[in-house]
Each structure stands twice: as structure tokens, then as C-alpha cells.
């Protein structure tokens, strides 16, 4: 079936059709939503409905109607699918007149509660002070008004292109003649590959043509050999060359480069190299570079001349159609005209040949056969027939089919019966299939207009009613008893019998018997009562067929005209569905019908897979089994069945090896799976589509193909991202089948019918058609000619995205100020195009630089750009524990972003202590994800340095841009600036969340905000309770997903209204954005709409501040004016920083930031939001050698002495010097400063001259930064001060006797065990403060706390009454009184398995918040117990 050009019809149905949608297995998977029943209908209907709805969504129609011939179950299916796609569906009418309409949502329908903002006195004071000192200037005001004319685009373009020297590009090099290839152990293997036979033909065709398509089956050798053919030919003929070969996956680029280098007996980085996002191994000698599509694209952004020295570009695996490959081909096609010597080779296993021939203009195609053995194919009907698989539902359906057959027999007797010859026998209750009313199949609140019982309600009727109705219908038909109609109408009107009631023995309805007997007035009566003219009897006849068969011409005319009026204007999609029914035998058709009525095939039938697997293992030869599943949940579910739940397998685990393949899984399976198993052991591989092309397992003989894949797609109409389970393409199905014939003939079991296969897409939907295009639209402006609109350039793509999606993406870029009205990139836009993250995350990072809270935002942005580090637990029982882990990391801050940040920081601490793997398992985190995030931070920070946002020294250095990193309110302001327009508002009256386009939004179950802080069982109305618990009326979110018809938001944070007012909306507000109370009125709301005069009066006194079409605030006139001016100061500061990132900050700039921070902090406190500690801590020291893909951060030389320690992404040599310099005054936690707890002499005086410490081996402070060890400057030097802006650390010190503590208090010294020394020294260096809390073992008390004031030396004290203690260090005692343990019973330490703080070993570190709370307990001691020292 051909795909409509605009969009894939393969959008899933949440209960069927084209893919298991969000409802059964929403993002992250797991079970159907509560209250949703499976909807089981024929495949033909599912496919037709999907096509119709997709065409409607992307077309210009506002409304669409479906025919009344649909059954209630089919209507239910359409309701659920429509709702999951963000459409509004309604059923109207009764009986035969019941039809369904689908409408597009109108954003204007969204009602919302009033948006207000009440400022505290301190906030007003802070803004007034700023404005009085530095008023908004005319220049600032003018710059922030909407532009009225276009600037000199050519000048700006040239300047900005020069400015944006992006990282991650391929190096410039000149073509050279390759060296001769070396002989290797792989030579004989190379010569056995199918592609080897065509070497001369391939080289010749490439020489003669600019573009060549090569289609070769997986395993034919095209990826590794074709680039080598070109190198060898150039060596042989003395021709210089330089080749780029792109791969869609990073791992593939590395693996192929390493393999090719090995085949040529070279080291990687010589003739053969690779470059991916975080790593490169290339040199000036490199002539063949393997890279990702994204890397080549970024190279092209530097200008068309970047390919002037390249001779060949090979784009491999083109069939994957990721957005970068399609985009790349668009640009390369243009460049072929400019570079006459450039050759382009497209290579793939399943290329859409005709599409690319058309696109590149009749270029030659080379086909390379693989060497697989024959693979037998079995579709669903074949599997059901040969294995005899059945289940309870299938048996039930078959029983009901027998009942239907009996009805047909009785019907036939009716048709042939003579009048008066048939006497009705005893009527029995009918037991036909009970299909629930369409609205029972939906979740709460279908469209509620449906009150009539459906035609399937006979089971609900009492036996006497069934008997009476059967008797009446029999009399009408057999005796032509017209008077019986009076009783039928009476029962329909008074006893709630359906007008479409079916005779229990024949399935005939009143309309059918009236039509067959020619009772015209009764037919009209029944139609007016809502009878369904499309209802069919058990033999498939409708009322019209009865009338035709029995020659009732008047009735035929009546029914035909009525049917025509019903169907007028409705879409007839049946012609689009290639039913091809003649291919199916009656037996197969029945088997499929029974199966589809028993199981919703939009999910994956694990029962059927287990049945198949058992059959293979007990009746087939040896050979590995490869099972293709859509995602993580299905893989784990099936694995658990095999290993634990199914006794047929669980009792024989020694006979199987189960492997799991998934791109995100923490598993070494991907290497182990390639090895052959021991004799007598069968390998069972559970895999996603990663095993289609990326990983080849040679001993696979059996493939079980679920036919499903999980695809992330962006709905540009509703701005929602959906993770959908969808049907694979035919090309993928063929690839999967080919995996079975690698070593000998195999079998491929397909869990879908031939009909489904025939209606699959030929090829996968290009990513360009299903992903957000903002990033590509930015790139388009750098790749396309200056005056070329984005849409025009993207229209040149092999399959252009729908204009609507491009329009929406461009609009989003305008919304976030990356583009102006004329689609020209703004100053911000040029910087965003340079950053290797999505535009909104890039904006977040740039705002963080200006707000000086970079570090936490770097971590959060990279996490959002990559993926959630929290993994789904393997065991279902652990899912609750996983949620609690996530919640614990939020520290009560009402923020999922906080959980991401603190999880990363805690992982880094665990890593520095050497137990990161156990930490990840315990906290359900992905180690690999964390490591990638570190690499992404490195790259992002490198780009910020290159652009001048982070300087090497002085103002704007790494310390300066982290001045406010410890202030969570400021960090959230940067989040808000980046997340806009992803906002929701709390409607307190109705306890619902509303968005710009959504009346009702819910928290995704994975969000910590979805679970209010209840210690016992959560309340039944969880969402309402969660909303009620929110401290503010505003939330930001990262992603909106749709599970069924409800929009869910995930990764949310509660924020204050003032943050929204200052950081959301466009920088350039219209001059009338602020309306004073006198001129303000609410459009469209009559004056009498208010409930009381008082309310009218109150509202009338408020000013209105309109930030965009949705954000309309009503607030006091003074507050509105102050906030508008604060906005203007912020946006003009941000604009100045974008124009000149390296320029020193002015007095105005500094004052503006100080005022903003004061406002944010005050309002945060006023809202009751907590300020967790430790969020600004810099990344801990970490050896880059331990990280994957890290060589781009490593020095090519070996590491030198500690004085030359290599610093991380975050520390330049210059900064290292700064770190040794005297520290500014340290800032203790405000609470202690106010209470006078801390030593009054604490400051710089006692430390400013202390400049170095003893040299430490570099291995103790491995790379990326944060805590270098400066070299020693001589013996006996004092310790320098700890680093400012670093977190406070807390440790428990256990003493074996009280005497040691008395000595410590007298002399101000302490010693600990050698095992604790390194940990404390490191903490002393990394932190602004280290507190030690003392407890004598067995005393039941804490005996006070001190702060550490020097590093631990080598000198030992003879005073201690304990053996085994190490060197002495200085401490300053702050509190010396005893605190009973019962005071601290409520404090649990997350860093010690959530044990109570008193249950700590010597040297146990406390989580910062817990430590802070513990120290505060001394303030609560009764007065008589206090004994504070100076």
C-alpha cells in the first residue's frame, strides 16, 4: 500500500490500528490504563480508520463524519484512537441514525483560572532600588519593541557565520595517495564475501557516475569493503583521495572503522579513522573517516567549501531514514553541482530504490546478493493452524460461532417456511457475544450523550422478555401478524428493549422482518425509533437484502434512499484496504477471526511467543532463536517467563542461555551473544530492532517477529511527543526474516497475518516526518542560501515533512526568540545553532551563563538531551522502590529536575568512593547514561568556551559563571527560560492543571509530583491530592505525552509566578502589553458574568500584563509596572551578553543580576519552597580513562607529574593557577551565621597567606577537574583555604572513649583512622566547610560538633588513649554539649541505606541536608543543656 506523502498512516491505535498506542503501553510501557478494556475489531476496519484519521489530521478539514454502519465496538475504537491523537469525537443519534463525528481541537476553547502574582514587600523594594539606580533607558526600551523592518541580513549573516565556529566538525585535510594495504588474517574472509566478486564493477560504475546506489543484503560486506575498494583502486592508479563514510549509529562508526583498520593491518587513526560526537581518532594521514550523519552535517555548516577536498562521500544504511541522513542528502544533492569531482555513494540493505532514483535523477543501482540460506516464512494464520494454539477467549468465540451457525440454519427454515407451518417452540435465552456499549470501552467520561441500549444487549434482558420478543418476531414473519408490532413497540418503549433486538434463534431484527414482509409504515416507524439499517443477520443480510430477496420494491426504495442520506459525504476507505481475501482459506479466515476476537493484536502476545518457543525447543533442530520485541518491558516480561514463571523452561534453565539486546541496557550481552553456546544449550535472544542491522548473530536459525517497534514521534499538531508501539515496515520485516538464514536454512515466525503484512508501509516512516524539527530548522538557516525560507529548503528533502510541521517548528523558534518575524536567525539563534543540544535546552544553558548558575543547568540540560538516567526495574515488585528512590533525590523540592541533578551528584560521589555500580543498581540508575552525560557536559562546556561565554580567567571564568549555582530559585529561572512555552497553570477551584491547548493535564506516573507526600496508602483521588499539595500555581515540564486522551506531563518543577512573569514570553513585548486598570477589560466577558459585585470591583482595580496569547496576568498596577521594568532589564542584559559574550560585565549588568536573584529568592521563600543544599557542587574528580568514548578529552601524551595534572573539561591551566590563589571570604550557611553558631574569627585572615599543600600523587585526584592537587612548595606550609562555592560536608566521628574528646576540645586537634584520612583530606579540599559530629561509642549521645580547619598531617599525637590513629589535624569546636540520640531519631541518612544517623560507622558521611538538620538540633536543646563555646 503506498504511503500518503504527507504522513504515515501507521499511527497507532490505543486499542488497535496500526500500532499499540499510548494507552496500553504508554511511554515507558507497562499495562493498560486502569478501566480501559481491550477493543477487538477486524483488521480491515482498523487499517481503514487509521488512514482516514491521518488524512483528516493533516488536511484542512475541521470536522469529519464516520458512517452509521459502524458497530458500537468499532465506534469505541474510533473514539479511543481519536482521543489518543488529540481529536474530539462525539457519537450522536440513536440506532441506525447513530453516527460519529471527529473534530480538531481549537486552542481557544481552553478556559483557565485567573493568573495572578502578589509580590512581597522585599521584592518590590529590590526592584525599586534597581530601577531608581539604573532606570530602563530609551535604548533598552526601543531594542525590546517588536521589529518593524528587516535588518541587513547579508551583513549579519556573514558576521555570525564567521563567529559560529562550531565544534564537532571533521578536520580539513588534503587528498593523498593511500598507502598499500597490509596483509591480514581477514583476507580469506574478505574474499568470501558476496561484494568481493563485484569489486571491479563497483569501482568502474563509481568512476563513471556522480551518484551510485548500492543495495546489498545484510552480511554481503558492503559497509566494510566498498570504502576499501576505493582506497585500493586509488593506490593502484596513484590517484589522491579523501573519503567520508557516514553511519546512523555512533557504535557502528567506531566498530566499522576498527574492523576496516584491522583488515588493512593498520592502527586506528592512521589511514582509517573515525569521528563521532564525543570522540575522534584521526590524524593528518587519515583518508577514510567514518563518522555519524550529524558530524558531517555540522561540518557542512561551516560553508560549502568544506567538501572541496573530499573525493567520495558514502552514506551507509540509508534505509534507516533518520532526520540527519535525509537532511544530509538534501544538502549533498545541492553540493554535487558545486563540486564536480565529488562522488556520492548511497548504500543500504533495503533501499527505497525508486524514491532515490527519482531524487538523484536516474543514477545507476548495483545489487549485491547476500549469502543466506532459504528461510521458510510462517504468518499468524499458519502458526495458529500448524501449532494448534488456542486460548480461553478463542474457545469462547468458537462456541458463539456455533450458536451463529445454528441461527443461520433456523433463518433458512424461516425463509422457506410456509405460512402457519411453523409453531414457535419454547424460547430460550440467547447467549450471543456480549460486546459492551462503546462508552464502557472508553475511560471515564466518553461523550455521555449515549443513553440508548445497543443491539447487543440481549443478555441483560429477563427471560420472559426474550421469550415475548422472540414470539412476536416469529409471529410477524411466519404468520404476517401485523398486530404483533403493537406489542414490539410497547416492549421497546416501556421495557427498555433495544429497537435492534435480535431473535435469539435466527438473529433477525424487527426491521428485517418488517422489510421482508413489506410492512412499509412499520419500517418507517422503526427507522424513526432509531433502528440500525446496517445491522446484519447471522447470514450477513441487512434489512435491505431481506426486502430485495422477497421482492418488496417499495421497502427497497425506502431503505436505499435512507441509507444514501446517511452515507452522503462520508469517506469510503474500503478501497484503500487491500483485503485480498481470496488468498485466505475459510479455515484460516475463521482462525484469524477467532484470534483477533480473543487478543488485541495491537499489543504483543507473550503467551503465543511462549507457545512457539516451546514448540521450537521440543520439536526442532538445534539453533539459536532470535525474538524481535518492541521494547524493554516486553523483553524483561518474556525473560521472566522463560527463567522463572513458565515451568516448562524454568525447570530446565541449564538447557538455555537467554540474552537481552537493547540499546540502553546495562548488559554485556551484546558481546556475549556473538559467541557460540556449549553443546546441548540453545541460545534465546530477546532483542529490539537493534538486531535488524546493527548486530549480526551468525548462528540464528529461528526468528520470532512480533512485528512491532517502539518509535518516538512528535505530534506537531498538538505539540506532544509520543512513544508508540507501531507496526514495522515491510523492509524491516524482510530484514528480520533474513536473520534466520545465516548458517543454514531457517524459519521465520511472524505474529501478524498476511493481510497485515500486505498493508504495512514499504519502508519506515522517515524521522523527518515524525520528530520535532526546531533543531533542523536552525541548521537549515546555516545550510541554505541567505534568502531561502526554511520550508523551501526542506521541500527539497527526499520526502519533505508536511508544511504544517515545518510551520509549527519555525513558529516555535520564533516563540523562543531564535528567529525573527522574517525567519532570520537572531543573535540567540546563531548561538543555539552552535550548541549540540535542542534549541530550548541551548537557551536554558545560555540563560544559566548569564544568571551565573551554569553547573547544575549543564547537568540537567545534558540529562534532558540524552535520556532519563532512571531505569525501569527488572522486577515489577521493584517499581515502587524505584519511584521512592527518585522521590528521595528531590529532597522535597517539588521538582523532577532536582531528582536528575542530585542523582547525578550522588552517583559522582559514589564513583569517587569506588562503589558506583552498586549505587546504580540500588538506586535504579543507568551507569552508561551517567557516563554519557559527563561527556556531553564536557562538549557543551567546550563549545561555551569557544563562543566566549566561559572565559579562562577573571570575570566570566568557570567560578564566576557558578556564583549562584547553589541558589535553586535562580537555577529554576534558567529552567523556566528554556522550557517556555512548556507551562501549565493550576486551577485551584477545580483542582486541575491546564495548558495553552489542554483543558486538563495530568502528571505522568513517572513524575515525583504525581505522588503527594502521603506516608500511608495514597488517596483514591491521587491527582487532585497531588495538585492540592503544590505550593505554587505554576509548573514547567520537559515533555507532554499522550496516553489515551489525557495529556500527561513528565519531568516537572513547581515555580513561582514571578519567575514566569520575568522569564517567559518573547523578549520583545508590544507597547500595549501592560494595560492599566482604567483601560483594561476582559474581551468577550460581559460585565454581569461575575458572581458578585465585589469580584467585579476587585478585578477592575487590577492591571493586565499580557505576555503571549495565553499568559494574561492580572496584578496590582505598581507590581505590574515594576515587573515589566525588571523584565526589560533582564532581556536587555541577555541581549547584550548574546551580542558580546566575552565583553566584561558592567555595573548595570551586575546590579541587574543581583536584583533578579533577590526577587527570585524572596518569592521562592514566600511560596514555601525549600532550598536544598549542595546543588551547586562542581563535578567530582573522575578519571577520563574510565569513561567510554573519551579519547577526545585525553591528551595524546602520557600523564606527567602531579604538577602537570591534566585537568578536565572544566579546568584550564589558567584556572588551576587561580585555584591556588587566595580565596575570597567564605560564606557559611546563612542559618548558622545568623545564630552565631560558627566561630567568629572564621574568614580569610587566618588563611590568606596559605598557598599550598603537600604533593599528592595524581592518581588520587584523577581528571575531570574540580579538585586538582597543587604541587608542594616546601615542608611545613599551612593549608590553603577550602574552595568557596562548594558544598558543606558532614561526617560522623566515633570515639572509643570520652577522654579523647576532652583532649580535642582543650587542644583543638583530632586524629582519625588512616582509612578515613584520604576521604577527609579530599573533602577539606573540595568543600567550603567540613563539619565533624562526634559520638562516643555506647554513650547514646552525640557529644557536639566542630569544623575541620586544616588538612591531616603526618605528625601523630601521643595524647590519644587509642591505638591505630593517624596524623593530627586542627578542628574548631562549635558546640560541646551532648545531644541525646532520641532527638535525632527522625533523621535518616540516604548515604547509609537510609539508616538513622546515630547508626553510623566512624567516618560515615551524611547527606548535606541531613547533616544540616542534625546540626540545627543543638539549637533546640533545653537552655540548661546549652554550653556554646566561642
Swiss-Prot record:
A motif (DEAH box) lies at residues 316-319. Its EC number is 3.6.4.13. It comes from the Eukaryota. It catalyses: ATP + H2O = ADP + phosphate + H(+). Residues 1164-1174 have a biased composition (Polar residues). Residues 612-784 form the Helicase C-terminal domain. The keyword ATP-binding applies. Residues 14-33 have a biased composition (Gly residues). Residues 203-369 form the Helicase ATP-binding domain. Residues 1191-1200, 1250-1264 have a biased composition (Low complexity). Residues 1288-1418 form the YTH domain. RNA binds at residues 1294-1296, 1310, 1360. It is found in: Cytoplasm; Cytoplasm, Perinuclear region. Residues 1-37, 1164-1288 are annotated as: Disordered. ATP binds at residues 216-223. Residues 1231-1249 have a biased composition (Basic and acidic residues). ANK repeats lie at residues 506-538, 539-571. GO terms for cellular component: cytoplasm; perinuclear region of cytoplasm; ribonucleoprotein granule. GO terms for molecular function: 3'-5' RNA helicase activity; ATP binding; ATP hydrolysis activity; N6-methyladenosine-containing RNA reader activity; RNA binding. 3'-5' RNA helicase that plays a key role in the male and female germline by promoting transition from mitotic to meiotic divisions in stem cells. Specifically recognizes and binds N6-methyladenosine (m6A)-containing RNAs, a modification present at internal sites of mRNAs and some non-coding RNAs that plays a role in the efficiency of RNA processing and stability. Essential for ensuring a successful progression of the meiotic program in the germline by regulating the level of m6A-containing RNAs. The YTH domain mediates RNA-binding. It recognizes and binds N6-methyladenosine (m6A)-containing RNAs. Interacts with MEIOC; binds transcripts that regulate the mitotic cell cycle inhibiting progression into metaphase, thereby allowing meiotic prophase to proceed normally. Interacts (via ANK repeats) with XRN1. Interacts with ZCCHC4. Associates with the small ribosomal subunit. Interacts with RBM46. Belongs to the DEAD box helicase family. DEAH subfamily. This is 3'-5' RNA helicase YTHDC2.
Amino acid at each position: 500500500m503506498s504511503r500518503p506523502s504527507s504522513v504515515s498512516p501507521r499511527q497507532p491505535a490505543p486499542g488497535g490500528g496500526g500500532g499499540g498506542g499510548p494507552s496500553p503501553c504508554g511511554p515507558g510501557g507497562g499495562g493498560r490504563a486502569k478501566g480501559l478494556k481491550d477493543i477487538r475489531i477486524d483488521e480491515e476496519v482498523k487499517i481503514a480508520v487509521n488512514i482516514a484519521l491521518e488524512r483528516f489530521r493533516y488536511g484542512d478539514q475541521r470536522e469529519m463524519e464516520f458512517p452509521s454502519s459502524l458497530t458500537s465496538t468499532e465506534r469505541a475504537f474510533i473514539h479511543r484512537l481519536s482521543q489518543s491523537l488529540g481529536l474530539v469525537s462525539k457519537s450522536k443519534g440513536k440506532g441506525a441514525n447513530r453516527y460519529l463525528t471527529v473534530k480538531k481541537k481549537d486552542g481557544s476553547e481552553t478556559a483557565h483560572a485567573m493568573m495572578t502574582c502578589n509580590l512581597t514587600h522585599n521584592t518590590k523594594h529590590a526592584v525599586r532600588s534597581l530601577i531608581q539606580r539604573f532606570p530602563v533607558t530609551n535604548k533598552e526600551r526601543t531594542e525590546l519593541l517588536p521589529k518593524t523592518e528587516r535588518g541587513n541580513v547579508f551583513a549579519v549573516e556573514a558576521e555570525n557565520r564567521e563567529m559560529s565556529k562550531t565544534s564537532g566538525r571533521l578536520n580539513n585535510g588534503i587528498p593523498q595517495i593511500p598507502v598499500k594495504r597490509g596483509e591480514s588474517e581477514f583476507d580469506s574472509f574478505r574474499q568470501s564475501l558476496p561484494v568481493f566478486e563485484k569489486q571491479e564493477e563497483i569501482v568502474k560504475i563509481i568512476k563513471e557516475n556522480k551518484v551510485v546506489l548500492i543495495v546489498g543484503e545484510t552480511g554481503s560486506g558492503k559497509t566494510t569493503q566498498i570504502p576499501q575498494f576505493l582506497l585500493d583502486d586509488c593506490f593502484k592508479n596513484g590517484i589522491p583521495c579523501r573519503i567520508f563514510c557516514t553511519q546512523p549509529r555512533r557504535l557502528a562508526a567506531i566498530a566499522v572503522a576498527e574492523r576496516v583498520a584491522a583488515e588493512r593491518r593498520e592502527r586506528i587513526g592512521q589511514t582509517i579513522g573515525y569521528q563521532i560526537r564525543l570522540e575522534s581518532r584521526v590524524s593528518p594521514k587519515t583518508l577514510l573517516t567514518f563518522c555519524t550523519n550529524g558530524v558531517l552535517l555540522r561540518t557542512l555548516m561551516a560553508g560549502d567549501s568544506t567538501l572541496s577536498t573530499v573525493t567520495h562521500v558514502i552514506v551507509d544504511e540509508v534505509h534507516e531514514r533518520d532526520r540527519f541522513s535525509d537532511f544530509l542528502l538534501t544538502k549533498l544533492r545541492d553540493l554535487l553541482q558545486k563540486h564536480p569531482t565529488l562522488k556520492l555513494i548511497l548504500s543500504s540493505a533495503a533501499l527505497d530504490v525508486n524514491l532515490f532514483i527519482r531524487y538523484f535523477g536516474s543514477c545507476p543501482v548495483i545489487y549485491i546478493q547476500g549469502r543466506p540460506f532459504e528461510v521458510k516464512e510462517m504468518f499468524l494464520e499458519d502458526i495458529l493452524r500448524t501449532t494448534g494454539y488456542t486460548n480461553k477467549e478463542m474457545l469462547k468465540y468458537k462456541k458463539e460461532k456455533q450458536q451463529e451457525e445454528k441461527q443461520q440454519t433456523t433463518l433458512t427454515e424461516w425463509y422457506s417456511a410456509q405460512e402457519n407451518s411453523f409453531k414457535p417452540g419454547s424460547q430460550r435465552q440467547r447467549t450471543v457475544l456480549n460486546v459492551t456499549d462503546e462508552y464502557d470501552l472508553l475511560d471515564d467520561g466518553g461523550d455521555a450523550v449515549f443513553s440508548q441500549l445497543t443491539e447487543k444487549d440481549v443478555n441483560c434482558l429477563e427471560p420472559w422478555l426474550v421469550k415475548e420478543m422472540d414470539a412476536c418476531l416469529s409471529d410477524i414473519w411466519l404468520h404476517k401478524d401485523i398486530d404483533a408490532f403493537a406489542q414490539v413497540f410497547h416492549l421497546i418503549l416501556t421495557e427498555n428493549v433495544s429497537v435492534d433486538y435480535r431473535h435469539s434463534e435466527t438473529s433477525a431484527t424487527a426491521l428485517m422482518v418488517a422489510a421482508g414482509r413489506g410492512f412499509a409504515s412499520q419500517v418507517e416507524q422503526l427507522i424513526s425509533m432509531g433502528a440500525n439499517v446496517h445491522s446484519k443477520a447471522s447470514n450477513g443480510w441487512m434489512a435491505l437484502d431481506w426486502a430485495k430477496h422477497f421482492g418488496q420494491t417499495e421497502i427497497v426504495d425506502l431503505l436505499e434512499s435512507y441509507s444514501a442520506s446517511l452515507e452522503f459525504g462520508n469517506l469510503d476507505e474500503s478501497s484503500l484496504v487491500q483485503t485480498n481475501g481470496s488468498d485466505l482459506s475459510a479455515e484460516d479466515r475463521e482462525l484469524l477471526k477467532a484470534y483477533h476476537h480473543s487478543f488485541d493484536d495491537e499489543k504483543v502476545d507473550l503467551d503465543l511467543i511462549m507457545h512457539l518457543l516451546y514448540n521450537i525447543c521440543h520439536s526442532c533442530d538445534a539453533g539459536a532463536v532470535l525474538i524481535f520485541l518492541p521494547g524493554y518491558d516486553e523483553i524483561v516480561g518474556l525473560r521472566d517467563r522463560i527463567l522463572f514463571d513458565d515451568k516448562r523452561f524454568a525447570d530446565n534453565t541449564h538447557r538455555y542461555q537467554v540474552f537481552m539486546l537493547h540499546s540502553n541496557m546495562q548488559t554485556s550481552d551484546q558481546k556475549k551473544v556473538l559467541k557460540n553456546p556449549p553443546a546441548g544449550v540453545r541460545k534465546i535472544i530477546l532483542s529490539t530492532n537493534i538486531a535488524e542491522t546493527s548486530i549480526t548473530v551468525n548462528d540464528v536459525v529461528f526468528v520470532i517477529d512480533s512485528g512491532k517497534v517502539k518509535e518516538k514521534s512528535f505530534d506537531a499538531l498538538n505539540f506532544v511527543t509520543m512513544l508508540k508501539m507501531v507496526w514495522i515496515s515491510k523492509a524491516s520485516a524482510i530484514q528480520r526474516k533474513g536473520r534466520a538464514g545465516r548458517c543454514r536454512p531457517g524459519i521465520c515466525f511472524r505474529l501478524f497475518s498476511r493481510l497485515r503484512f500486505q498493508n504495512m508501509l514499504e519502508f519506515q516512516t522517515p524521522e523527518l516526518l515524525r520528530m520535532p524539527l526546531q533543531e533542523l530548522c536552525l541548521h537549515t538557516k546555516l545550510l541554505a542560501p541567505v534568502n531561502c525560507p526554511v520550508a523551501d529548503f526542506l521541500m527539497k528533502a527526499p520526502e519533505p515533512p508536511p508544511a504544517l510541521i515545518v510551520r509549527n517548528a519555525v513558529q516555535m523558534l520564533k516563540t523562543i526568540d531564535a528567529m525573527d518575524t522574517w525567519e532570520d536567525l537572531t543573535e540567540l539563534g546563531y548561538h543555539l545553532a552552535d550548541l549540540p543540544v535542542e534549541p530550548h535546552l541551548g537557551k536554558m544553558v545560555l540563560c544559566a551563563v548569564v544568571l551565573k548558575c551554569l553547573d547544575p543547568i549543564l547537568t540537567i540540560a545534558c540529562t534532558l538531551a540524552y535520556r532519563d538516567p532512571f531505569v525501569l526495574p527488572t522486577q515489577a515488585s521493584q517499581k515502587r522502590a524505584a519511584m521512592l528512590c527518585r522521590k528521595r533525590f528531590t529532597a522535597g523540592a517539588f521538582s523532577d529536575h532536582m531528582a536528575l541533578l542530585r542523582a547525578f551528584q550522588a552517583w559522582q560521589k559514589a564513583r569517587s568512593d569506588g562503589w558506583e555500580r552498586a549505587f546504580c543498581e540500588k538506586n535504579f540508575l543507568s551507569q552508561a547514561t551517567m557516563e554519557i552525560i559527563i561527556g556531553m557536559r564536557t562538549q557543551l562546556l567546550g563549545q561555551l568556551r569557544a563562543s566566549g561565554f566561559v572565559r579562562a580567567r577573571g570575570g566570566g571564568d568557570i567560578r564566576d559563571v557558578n556564583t549562584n549555582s547553589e541558589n535553586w530559585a535562580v537555577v529554576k529561572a534558567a529552567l523556566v527560560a528554556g522550557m517556555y512555552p512548556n507551562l501549565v497553570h493550576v486551577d485551584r477551584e477545580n483542582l486541575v492543571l491546564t495548558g495553552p491547548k489542554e483543558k486538563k493535564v495530568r502528571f505522568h506516573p513517572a513524575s515525583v509530583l504525581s505522588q503527594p507526600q502521603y506516608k500511608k496508602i495514597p488517596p483514591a483521588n491521587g491527582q487532585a491530592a497531588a495538585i492540592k499539595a503544590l505550593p505554587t500555581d505554576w509548573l514547567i515540564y520537559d515533555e507532554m505525552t499522550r496516553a489515551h486522551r489525557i495529556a500527561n506531563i513528565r519531568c516537572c518543577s513547581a515555580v513561582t509566578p514571578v519567575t514566569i512573569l520575568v522569564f517567559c514570553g518573547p523578549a520583545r513585548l508590544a507597547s500595549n502589553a501592560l494595560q492599566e486598570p482604567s483601560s483594561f477589560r476582559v474581551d468577550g466577558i460581559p460585565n454581569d458574568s461575575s458572581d458578585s459585585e465585589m469580584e467585579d470591583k476587585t478585578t477592575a482595580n487590577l492591571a493586565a500584563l499580557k505576555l503571549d496569547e495565553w499568559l494574561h496576568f492580572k496584578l496590582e498596577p505598581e507590581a505590574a509596572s515594576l515587573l515589566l521594568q525588571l523584565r526589560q532589564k533582564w532581556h536587555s542584559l541577555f541581549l547584550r551578553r548574546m551580542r558580546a559574550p566575552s565583553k566584561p560585565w558592567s555595573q548595570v549588568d551586575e546590579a541587574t543580576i543581583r536584583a533578579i536573584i533577590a526577587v527570585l529568592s524572596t518569592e521562592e521563600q514566600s511560596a514555601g519552597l525549600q532550598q536544598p543544599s549542595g546543588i551547586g557542587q562542581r563535578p567530582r574528580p573522575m578519571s577520563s580513562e574510565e569513561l567510554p568514548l573519551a579519547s577526545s578529552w585525553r591528551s595524546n601524551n602520557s600523564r606527567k607529574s602531579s604538577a602537570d595534572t591534566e585537568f578536565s573539561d572544566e579546568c584550564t591551566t589558567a584556572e588551576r593557577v587561580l585555584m591556588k590563589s587566595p580565596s575570597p571570604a567564605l560564606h557559611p550557611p546563612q542559618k548558622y551565621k545568623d545564630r552565631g553558631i560558627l566561630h567568629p574569627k572564621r574568614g580569610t585572615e587566618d588563611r590568606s597567606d596559605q598557598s599550598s599543600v603537600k604533593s599528592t600523587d595524581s592518581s588520587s585526584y584523577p581528571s575531570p577537574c574540580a579538585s586538582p592537587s597543587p604541587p608542594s612548595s616546601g615542608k611545613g606550609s599551612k593549608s590553603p583555604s577550602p574552595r568557596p562555592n562548594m558544598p558543606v560536608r558532614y561526617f560522623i566521628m566515633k570515639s572509643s572513649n570520652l577522654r579523647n574528646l576532652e583532649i580535642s576540645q582543650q587542644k583543638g586537634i583530632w586524629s582519625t583512622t588512616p582509612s578515613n584520612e584520604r576521604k577527609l583530606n579530599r573533602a577539606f579540599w573540595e568543600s567550603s566547610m567540613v563539619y565533624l559530629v562526634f559520638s562516643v561509642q555506647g554513650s547514646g549521645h552525640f557529644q557536639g560538633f566542630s569544623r575541620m580547619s586544616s588538612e591531616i598531617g603526618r605528625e601523630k599525637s601521643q595524647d590519644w588513649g587509642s591505638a591505630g590513629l593517624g596524623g593530627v589535624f586542627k578542628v574548631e569546636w562549635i558546640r560541646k554539649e551532648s545531644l541525646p540520640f532520641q532527638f535525632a531519631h527522625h533523621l535518616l541518612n540516604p548515604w547509609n541505606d537510609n539508616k538513622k544517623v546515630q547508626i553510623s560507622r566512624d567516618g560515615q558521611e551524611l547527606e548535606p541536608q541531613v547533616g544540616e538538620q542534625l546540626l540545627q538540633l543543638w539549637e533546640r536543646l533545653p537552655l540548661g543543656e546549652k554550653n556554646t563555646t566561642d
